[in-house]
């Protein structure tokens, strides 16, 4: 009887009234989410002589919200060597919440022990990041470790071609940048032609003068007569007994045809001297020009004699390229190839400041000729700068010239990477010696990224090997789409996978959000589904209302649980992240950490105060 009355009560009006009233009371008393008490951040990790990087504070792993006792998300030293990529849209806090705080922590390492100070390379495109790095070093007593290359007041001179990098690698890098900046057609001929021309021009100048600049490449590319003269000069320099023709100045002025040959004035005798090539010898004999023939130990025009057997073989290679390849190309096509590189390299000719900083004369690197520093201070080799703990910054904003800034920055990056990788055999041969770490810090990384299966100096190859050289790569870019648009094909995937730690801030494009969601992985999640059905017996249509009615009706409700594999973080979550809020996929050097929410520490706020407290105060 009581059971029947209870079931009857479930379908009466008082039950629905009481149920609704209790639901309202419960909702009002609950007040939405459970409030959290005061947030107690643990002390920041003490500098105990071990290098580590504090990324931010960690609360709930998969949901946004505070807990009373959060933790710090910290990467130990071994995890730093595997690379950190910061990816976030404009205004999401990449620089203020990641790049500045990370640089502060790394450059402050070692304290007063100069042997532990970390040096490296800083690349950026805006022009303000370098000033922040200088301020960081000054605050920690390292003002003398800062080396800046710029176009305004820097005393340093940097020649991107003055190193021991292979000529093909340098040429390929220049050609790749030209094709990526000014058109990436499917026809590989143009990049191959640019690479071949620049490679042999570099070889030619290194053989003759032990020195080459971007301006030298431009002058030889646009002047076929000069190129021919230097090829002949290299042939002559490789002869067993080199000779020169000597004329009196009056004789030189009497024959106009002599002007087409390169002549120098002897500073002592004031006589005219020129390399005695076959063509010059033939001219002198045909026109009965009074001259003398002398053996010489040095070349006119600042060249050097080539005595090394390997270098003589290289001279023959240059000669074969010039006569059997370059001169056989149709003149129109040859002109197109030259124009493809000359319009860009000409910037080093018509801009005096560029020429002064990036194309210094050979005397700049001669301690005797440049004893008074009149040619500027040559930038020391990166291998020396790294071991001294110096921080090199290229302050060349893209606003001045985007393409040129990328070219110079990329060439400097390649030079730095080569110096870093040369540390690997040294470290392996002396494991008992503690070698200092080195930092590669790049803001707006998509402006400097180079990658590709055929690129001998691709970034993905460097990052895959830099761990052994104790290099810490930290880069920031606006989105995965930025890398995708800069690099060809699917090579961006190869590059992205070399960064084991990925910090995702707010993303504003669908592609990047989807890729970030996939990278964070999937997990088995319990999905709830509801099913409602209604049935009636002896159904009829009410004449007054037009609705279906039934004398006996029943409603059935069912609830089902299914296990599905779904993304841990949906793509929309990455678009909804607030400023200084991130989802981090970290790697500690041994094991990958699960993706988690992380609350970053902007450089202008007290890191000892919780993110949510700053948010409550309106600081974020």
Residue ranges and their predicted role:
Residues 33-35, 60, 66-71, 75-471, ...:
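P-loop NTPase motor domains
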Residues 41-73:
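N-terminal pre-Walker A segment at the start of P-loop NTPase domains
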Residues 189-195, 203, 340, 381-383, ...:
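P-loop NTPase motor core of the ASCE superfamily
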Residues 1-49:
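N-terminal accessory nucleic-acid engagement/regulatory domains that precede
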Residues 478-482:
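Conserved H-loop
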């Amino acid at each position: 009887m009581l059971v029947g009355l209870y079931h009857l009560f479930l379908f009466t009006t008082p039950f629905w009234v009481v149920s609704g009233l209790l639901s309202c009371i419960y909702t009002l008393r609950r007040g939405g989410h459970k409030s959290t008490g005061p947030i107690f951040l643990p002390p920041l990790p003490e500098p105990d002589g071990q290098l580590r990087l504090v990324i931010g504070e960690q609360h709930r792993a998969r949901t946004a919200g505070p807990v009373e006792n959060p933790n710090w998300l910290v990467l130990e030293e071994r995890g730093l060597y595997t690379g950190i990529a910061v990816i976030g849209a404009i205004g999401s806090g990449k620089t203020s919440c990641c790049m500045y705080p990370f640089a502060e922590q790394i450059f402050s390492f070692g304290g007063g022990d100069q042997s532990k100070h970390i040096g490296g390379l800083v690349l950026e495109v805006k022009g303000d990041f370098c000033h922040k790095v200088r301020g960081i070093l000054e605050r920690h007593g390292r003002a003398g470790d800062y080396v800046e290359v710029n176009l305004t007041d820097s005393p340093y001179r940097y020649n991107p071609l003055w190193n021991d990098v292979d000529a093909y690698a340098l040429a390929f890098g220049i050609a790749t940048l030209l094709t990526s900046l000014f058109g990436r057609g499917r026809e590989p001929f143009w990049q191959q032609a640019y690479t071949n021309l620049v490679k042999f021009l570099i070889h030619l100048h290194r053989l003759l003068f032990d020195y080459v600049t971007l301006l030298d490449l431009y002058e030889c590319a646009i002047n076929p007569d000069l190129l021919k003269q230097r090829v002949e000069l290299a042939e002559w320099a490789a002869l067993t007994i080199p000779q020169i023709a000597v004329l009196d100045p009056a004789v030189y002025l009497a024959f106009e045809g002599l002007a087409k040959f390169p002549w120098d004035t002897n500073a002592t005798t004031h006589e005219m001297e020129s390399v005695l090539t076959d063509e010059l010898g033939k001219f002198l004999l045909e026109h009965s020009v009074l001259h003398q023939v002398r053996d010489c130990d040095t070349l006119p025009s600042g060249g050097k004699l080539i005595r090394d057997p390997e270098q003589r073989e290289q001279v023959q290679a240059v000669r074969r390229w010039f006569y059997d390849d370059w001169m056989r190309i149709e003149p129109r096509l040859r002109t197109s190839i030259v124009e493809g590189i000359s319009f860009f390299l000409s910037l080093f000719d018509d801009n005096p400041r560029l020429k002064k900083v990036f194309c210094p004369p050979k005397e700049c690197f001669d301690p005797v000729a440049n004893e008074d520093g009149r040619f500027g201070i040559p930038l020391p080799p990166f291998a020396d700068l790294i071991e001294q703990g110096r921080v090199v910054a290229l302050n060349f904003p893209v606003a001045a010239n985007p393409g040129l800034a990328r070219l110079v920055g990329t060439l400097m990056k390649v030079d730095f990477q080569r110096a870093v990788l040369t540390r690997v055999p040294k470290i392996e041969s002396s494991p008992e010696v503690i070698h200092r770490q080195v930092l590669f810090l790049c803001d707006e990384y998509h402006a400097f990224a180079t990658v590709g299966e055929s690129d001998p100096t691709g970034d993905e190859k460097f990052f895959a090997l830099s761990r052994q050289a104790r290099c810490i790569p930290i880069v920031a870019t606006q989105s995965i789409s930025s890398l995708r648009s800069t690099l060809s094909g699917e090579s961006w995937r190869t590059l992205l996978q070399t960064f084991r730690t990925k910090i995702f801030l707010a993303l504003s494009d669908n592609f990047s959000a989807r890729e970030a969601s996939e990278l964070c992985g999937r997990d088995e999640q319990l999905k709830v589904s509801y099913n409602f059905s209604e049935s009636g017996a002896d159904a009829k249509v009410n004449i007054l209302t037009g609705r279906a009615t039934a004398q006996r009706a029943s409603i059935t409700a069912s609830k089902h649980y299914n296990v599905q594999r779904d993304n841990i973080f949906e793509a929309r979550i990455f678009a909804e992240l607030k400023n200084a809020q991130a989802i981090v996929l970290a790697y500690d050097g041994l094991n990958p950490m699960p993706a988690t929410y992380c609350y970053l520490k902007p450089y202008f706020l007290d890191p000892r105060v919780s993110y949510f407290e700053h948010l409550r105060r309106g600081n974020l």
